A protein has these predicted regions:
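Conserved N-terminal segment of class I S-adenosyl-L-methionine
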Residues: 1-111, 115, 125-128
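A short His-aromatic
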Residues: 116-120
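Short, glycine-/aromatic-enriched active-site segment of Class I SAM-dependent methyltransferases
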Residues: 141-166, 170-174
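A short glycine-rich, Lys/Arg-flanked "PGG" loop and its adjoining helix->strand segment in the class I
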Residues: 125-142
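Substrate-binding/catalytic lobe of Class I Rossmann-like enzymes that use SAM or dcSAM, i.e.
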Residues: 174-180
């Protein structure tokens, strides 16, 4: 169906999030993903310091890259499947095995990071707004996202699925971010 407010294509019937993400189901990570995380972390490290929130980092790929940065005090990772991967908290990496909720944030972050999360959000305008409200002026939000319409045009028809529930486009991303 097409959304009447933002005009994007989206799935009509959504699986409740607590059922969809009850168990981890993306267990393999290939070379492309590992390179993506390393490159994204290298980019982020040019700007970041202080306290960081990462949303959706179950395997801690980004957090492990970022923890090497001496300018970062802490990285709090929110994901519902952190512990099933055997992750352990460290002095710098804190684990919150839950869906991100602005009310559960203990201290103002200097940066919020989410890689390939935005396409999973059921109410992205509202959730991005809540994330941005946690940030002070001069803070950062780092996002990496697939562009679903371009993937589908390139023949990747699996880009829209039970987890990627709406057609992320560059224009829609711009509109979402400007609404914050």
């Amino acid at each position: 169906m097409r959304c009447s407010s933002c005009n994007c294509i989206q799935l009509k019937n959504l699986i409740p999030l607590d059922i969809l993400y009850e168990k981890a189901h993306a267990n393999s990570v290939g070379k492309t993903w590992l390179l993506h995380h390393a490159s994204f972390a290298d980019f982020i490290n040019n700007y970041i310091s202080g306290n960081v929130i990462e949303i959706g980092g179950a395997k801690l790929h980004l957090a492990k890259h970022l923890k090497k940065n001496d300018k970062i005090n802490s990285i709090t990772v929110y994901d519902t499947n952190l512990l099933c991967y055997g992750n352990k908290e460290t002095e710098k990496i804190k684990l919150r095995e839950e869906f991100f909720n602005k009310d559960s944030v203990l201290s103002k972050p200097d940066a919020i990071i989410h890689s390939h999360v935005i396409e999973h959000l059921y109410n992205p305008f509202k959730e991005l707004k809540e994330m941005s409200e946690l940030l002070e002026d001069g803070s950062y939000m780092f996002i990496s996202s697939p562009v679903i319409d371009e993937m589908m045009n390139d023949g990747f028809t699996n880009a829209m699925n039970f987890e990627h529930t709406y057609g992320v486009t560059k224009n829609l991303l711009h509109k979402m971010l400007c609404s914050c």
